[in-house]
Amino acid sequence: MLDVQWNQWPETLIVFLKWRLTCSKGEHLPETAGDKCMDKTPTLLQKGLAEMFGTGVLVLIGPGSIPAALLLINGGNGKAVFTMADLGFIGLAFAVAIAAMVYTIGHISGCHINPAVTLAFAVTKRIAWNEAAVYIIAQFIGGILGALGIALIFGASAASTIGFGPTNFSEAVTSYPQAIAIEALGTFLLLMVIMGTAVDGRAPAGWAGLIIGLIVAGEVIVMGPITGPSLNPARTFGPAILQVLFGGSYNLTHLIVYFVGPIIGGILGVVFYDFLTRARAATASKAAQNLQEASA
């Protein structure tokens, strides 16, 4: 704290108030006070570690809720049929994990915790490609670490019984193109919501984590019986790989669906949102120009 002498308290109070004001604005005073603000710009390493942590928590809680549900339904004796209530609670687990991470690491890395989000932002030049590469590597590592957490909780033997929660689909019911289209649609909707609540500066402050979590929960309920859904390559990759490594079974060719679909859908979602916002800006500009010409 500041070294206050009673005969200097007015000046000290002014310095302290300026320090608090600059901290709240994310600015810095000179070394005497500004170095006390905990808002320094994160390094790329810090951002990568935040993405790894966030993705790990997402996988631990989201996919981790699936073996938890199976354990309660049938005592861990294999597959079971989920009810809408089961899907609802699994969706809620994803929503809680996403909201918690948005509010925890959003100010550090932006809380992508999803390679499809990072790639979409890189393609639309919202993040540099070298930074995107670090994010994506960190996200996949985080997905693996999250799956290791699931193995720690339920035991390695769970890989061959209740599994580690990777997304999957039945080829007898759903073709690869249909599964890719479903994943693309789901990720398209997710990115539209992310853009509208977290990226667009006109969005109400403080709601992004909750709303993004809720759209994922809704998609889990609707698309869960068909493809999972994944909406996130790292979310599926970690549990799938660890499930196989620990003696369980998983058709790794299904990863094609959970990579291609989210990447396509994510890019389309950002591009479409940009189109919508540019269209509004162009319309407003044209209206202002017409008004100016009419008043001339």
Spans of features found by a protein language model:
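Compositionally biased, low-complexity intrinsically disordered regions
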Residues: W9-P10, A33
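Tryptophan (W) side chains
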Residues: W6-W9, W19
